[in-house]
Amino acid sequence: MLRRLILLLFVVQMSISAPPERAIVSAVDAGNARALSLLEQAVNINSGTHNFAGVRAVGDLFRKEFDALGFKTTWVDGAAFKRAGHLVADHPGRGPRILLVGHLDTVFEPDSPFQKFERIDDRTARGPGVIDMKGGDVVILAALEGLKSAGALDAMNIVVVMTGDEEDAGDPQEAARKPLVDAAEGAQYALGFEDGPGDPRYAVTARRGTSSWKLQVKGKTGHSSQIFRPDIGYGANYELARVLDGFRRKLAGEPHLTFNPSLLLGGSALDVDEVLSRGNASGKTNVIAERAVAIGDLRTLSKEQLQHARDTMKAVVAEAPLAQTEATLTFEDGYPSLPPTDGNAKLLAEYDRASRDLGFGPVAAVSPDRAGAADVSFISGQVKSIIDGVGLMGHDDHSPGETADLSTLPSQTKRAALLLYRLTQGTR
């Protein structure tokens, strides 16, 4: 057993024995303190999606870093899609085109009480966007800095896009994601640096897409003592309940599919604010509800599953409506899915090999059910090999307890840097 362990350690050591790879690892270690400082600076700038000045400020901070690395940087103004904009950094070179994806914004707007980077201990820090995803942005920069210091970056063909509206995409969405889609043109590989499942033993090779739906119901009002009469009917609320339960009966349990009616209102009069996802309803106990509405989301792993779910929901609405009611169901597209592909699996295998060679252990694909929506999904039809969730790890993102595991900053950076180097040199 001991002999096998010694042999294993020898193999791990020898697998990164090539001088360029050793130099990359050493350079990442040397730059870790600077990376931590950059992370703290970025987190201390509020960049809630709707704080345009803050998003631009984080973009300026990172832009200087890319400029110093020899990238040609561009700020894409977001006025056309009602957002701050995006940072694009391009480094033409030889070898395969590789796209790296990050985002500058967070869910924490200026009115949030959660505003500052706080070091908890040597291993952990808390702060708004520290893992989602300023930590991932810093992993990108630290990996490129390590490659530059080791003399390996100059020949690389890399483009980086850091969007300014990942947490709340601009409108129209097509315009908001055009810079990302354009950057993906000709790319053979793409890496997204979201925090993923928060566990460095996993990365993302598939993501479910998101869309929204709205069910609006009209009924015949009248005195409650007359409800269920054929000429009065059941009212809007009963029809809303019938349809929602039909969705549950027909679709619940289908693999990778979820649907959630998140906001329900019913009564004599409704006031719905769809932007802020809230509203008011008024009615009396002795009056039959005339109007009802339900708003929710739908998550699917493929275009085919999305269409199947929508068709099923439409059929439920159309079948046997309750007397004197009518319902209307509408859909709105959101983030597309990132389906699992052979190319994604092969890229993960290379990332896994780099991790093992560094002594960090294996990396497996996380279930798409545990992976939310992200920007890489918009390029799933263009780039054959995509992985995501390889940024800084931690827990409680999108909450005032968002916490980073700082011990994963150098390890995630080394994994990314070694993978980029090997992809450029040719898969081992």
Which positions does each model-derived feature cover?
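Metal-dependent amide/peptide-bond hydrolase catalytic core
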Residues: S17-A23, S47-G48, D195-G196, T205, ...
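Sec-dependent N-terminal signal peptides
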Residues: R4-V12
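Extracytoplasmic/secreted envelope proteins and their assembly/folding machinery
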Residues: L36-E40, G59, R63, L141, ...
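Positively charged n-region of N-terminal signal peptides that target proteins for export
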Residues: M1-R4, A155-M156
